[in-house]
């Protein structure tokens, strides 16, 4: 009787050890989204591994280098506007580099504000302010039940005169900062869509906990995301058997 009891205990520990040794590798998955007719590709890969107390850890990495290469077009699609009697804004060029756990975005923009007035029966269009500016924005990602979020902090604004004041203290600077953050956040959400990246059973039980930008191959921008997968050891073993 004692022998059988010891055998059962040994089998339980052996099964637990086998579960703890298993790692479910997530093969690279390519997703893409359109920016002005150009397909921007994001490649994501990762693994699910066992942790303490039968918890399973999720680790994902996404290569954002194609997003870096098409950043100017992405921001232009969200920020550019040309109102005849109002604001005209164009993104001339932009860069995004890793500064783990954040990333630093530098945008070169041209801005003008125009007003239309009627004089002597005709409309006169007059430029009120205009010039070039360089904005440096720190982007810090986070992750939670709702997915990836992005916080933006303006670190530096280079602009002369009244344009500098508009960007530093007016609503223009806030609007630009918020649109930059939402553009990058939306792009990463599309590239790290759990339903398309993970097996269905894992995606349905996954919760993201943390995210950070990291420097990948050749200094390219990657994002690393950690989380948990709430499945039983039996489900985890079943997923490995199906590979």
Segments and roles (model prediction):
Residues 18-243:
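Extracellular/lumenal and peripheral-membrane lipid-interaction modules
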Residues 1-4:
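Positively charged n-region of N-terminal signal peptides that target proteins for export
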Residues 6-13:
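Bacterial N-terminal signal peptides
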């Amino acid at each position: 009787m004692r022998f059988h009891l010891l055998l059962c205990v040994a089998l339980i520990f052996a099964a637990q050890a086998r579960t703890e040794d298993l790692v479910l590798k997530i093969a690279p998955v390519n997703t893409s989204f359109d920016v002005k007719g150009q397909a921007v590709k994001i490649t994501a890969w990762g693994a699910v591994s066992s942790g303490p107390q039968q918890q399973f850890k999720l680790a994902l990495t996404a290569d954002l280098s194609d997003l870096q290469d098409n950043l100017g077009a992405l921001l232009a699609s969200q920020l550019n506007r040309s109102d005849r009697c109002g604001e005209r804004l164009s993104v001339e060029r932009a860069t995004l580099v890793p500064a783990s756990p954040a990333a630093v975005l530098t945008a070169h923009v041209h801005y003008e504000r125009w007003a239309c007035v009627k004089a002597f029966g005709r409309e006169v269009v007059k430029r009120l302010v205009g010039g070039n500016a360089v904005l440096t924005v720190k982007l810090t990602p986070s992750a939670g039940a709702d997915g990836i979020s992005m916080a933006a902090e303006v670190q530096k604004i280079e602009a002369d005169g009244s344009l500098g004041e508009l960007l530093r203290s007016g609503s223009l600077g806030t609007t630009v900062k918020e649109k930059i953050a939402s553009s990058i956040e939306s792009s990463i959400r599309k590239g790290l869509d759990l339903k398309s990246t993970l097996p269905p059973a894992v995606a349905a039980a996954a919760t993201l906990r943390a995210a950070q930008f990291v420097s990948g191959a050749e200094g390219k921008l990657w994002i690393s995301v950690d989380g948990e997968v709430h499945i039983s050891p039996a489900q985890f073993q079943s997923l490995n058997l199906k590979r």
